[in-house]
């Protein structure tokens, strides 16, 4: 019994140590469908591999925040977290779209531009 209690305590201590591990987010920005000027589409910003879970994600059009929806926070087997932020948009050759991410591991917000050719 004492051995079981010791193992449980050791497990809890190792889990509490997860807060000390900080991982910067990885960011992918892409459209749901191949882009066509003037045709409605969805812009996605997939942010993954980060820890701790507190994060702020904004989709931008020409540097200005646009209305978006976000998935529920989820975690991977390695206890890192991931989220998907998305918004409906109509691409054209004049506008520039990007994703801005703020996280404790980043000295300043990271902005990743959408490349319509990817």
UniProtKB/Swiss-Prot annotation:
The keyword Secreted applies. CDD domains: IgC1_beta2m. Its main location: secreted. GO terms for molecular function: MHC class II protein complex binding; peptide antigen binding. InterPro entries: B2Microglobulin (IPR015707), Ig-like_dom (IPR007110), Ig-like_dom_sf (IPR036179), Ig-like_fold (IPR013783), Ig/MHC_CS (IPR003006), Ig_C1-set (IPR003597), MHC/Immunoglobulin (IPR050160). Residues 1-20 form the signal peptide. Disulfide bonds join 45-99. Keywords: Disulfide bond, Immunity, Immunoglobulin domain, MHC I, Secreted, Signal. It is found in: Secreted. Residues 25-112 form the Ig-like C1-type domain. GO terms for cellular component: extracellular region; late endosome membrane; lysosomal membrane; MHC class I protein complex; MHC class II protein complex. Gene3D superfamilies: Immunoglobulins (2.60.40.10). GO terms for biological process: antigen processing and presentation of exogenous peptide antigen via MHC class II; antigen processing and presentation of peptide antigen via MHC class I; immune response; peptide antigen assembly with MHC class II protein complex; positive regulation of immune response; positive regulation of T cell activation. Belongs to the beta-2-microglobulin family. Heterodimer of an alpha chain and a beta chain. Beta-2-microglobulin is the beta-chain of major histocompatibility complex class I molecules. Forms a heterotrimer with MR1 and a metabolite antigen. Component of the class I major histocompatibility complex (MHC). Involved in the presentation of peptide antigens to the immune system. This is Beta-2-microglobulin. It comes from Bos taurus. The gene is B2M.
């Amino acid at each position: 019994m004492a051995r079981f209690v010791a193992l449980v305590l050791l497990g809890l201590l190792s889990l509490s140590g997860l807060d000390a591990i900080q991982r910067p987010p990885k960011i992918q920005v892409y459209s749901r469908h191949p882009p066509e000027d003037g045709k409605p589409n969805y812009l996605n910003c997939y942010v993954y591999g980060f820890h701790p879970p507190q994060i702020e994600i904004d989709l931008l059009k020409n540097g200005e925040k646009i209305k978006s929806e976000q998935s529920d926070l989820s975690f991977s087997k390695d206890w890192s977290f991931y989220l998907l932020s998305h918004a409906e948009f109509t691409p054209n050759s004049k506008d520039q779209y990007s994703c801005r991410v703020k996280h404790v591991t980043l000295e300043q917000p990271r902005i990743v531009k959408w490349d319509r050719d990817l």
